[in-house]
């Protein structure tokens, strides 16, 4: 549809002529307090400086307005929020499956994977699955889980350790130790 009306997106802060208050508490470019002034006077000061008058806290009495470059303000705000998102790490739970009869070579490969997960800051879920007659030898499964726990004691803290078998499997959860 050509020439349609563009809906202006609502800004989080009112600027310049959008401000409705008669009097405002004014803050200068450098953050200095300029006192309570009329809206007209505040707009004139902002225009003199060649920047915008931005309503910072509309619910205050009188509303707090600041003389600033609004475009630069938005840019800095989005930049800082992107930085915060970058610093946040989502912790995932990675799962490795063992069997009571897992051979030494396979055990070492799975152990290396567990070490990598824990070093990356993720939690590790170790599932020990029993099949058929293996159910009769649950102590072998416990030995495997204890061996994993002992091999990773420098890197991880046990969050949950199975006391009994759940269905046909035992589950242990490890969390990485906090770095000093």
Curated annotation (Swiss-Prot):
Identify the PROSITE patterns for this entry. IF3 (PS00938)
Q: Which residues form the signal peptide?
A: none
> Which terms in the GO cellular component ontology are assigned?
cytosol
**What is one Gene Ontology biological process annotated in the Swiss-Prot or TrEMBL record?**
ribosome disassembly
Q: Where is this site: Important for 30S binding?
A: 107, 110
- Extract the InterPro entries matched here: T_IF-3_C_sf, T_IF-3_N_sf, Translation_initiation_fac3_CS, Translation_initiation_fac_3, Translation_initiation_fac_3_C, Translation_initiation_fac_3_N
For this UniProt entry, the molecular function terms from Gene Ontology, in alphabetical order, are:
ribosome binding; translation initiation factor activity
Gene3D superfamilies assigned to the protein according to its UniProt record, in alphabetical order: Translation initiation factor 3 (IF-3), C-terminal domain, Translation initiation factor 3 (IF-3), N-terminal domain
Query: Keywords on this record?
Result: Cytoplasm, Initiation factor, Protein biosynthesis
Chief subcellular site? cytoplasm
Cellular localisation: Cytoplasm
The protein's matches in Pfam families, at most eight in alphabetical order, are given as: IF3_C (PF00707), IF3_N (PF05198)
- Give the record's subunit note: Monomer.
Q: Which family does it belong to?
A: Belongs to the IF-3 family.
Q: What does this protein do?
A: IF-3 binds to the 30S ribosomal subunit and shifts the equilibrium between 70S ribosomes and their 50S and 30S subunits in favor of the free subunits, thus enhancing the availability of 30S subunits on which protein synthesis initiation begins.
The record's section on NCBIfam families has:
infC (TIGR00168)
Q: Protein name, please?
A: Translation initiation factor IF-3
Q: Which organism is it from?
A: Salmonella typhimurium (strain LT2 / SGSC1412 / ATCC 700720)
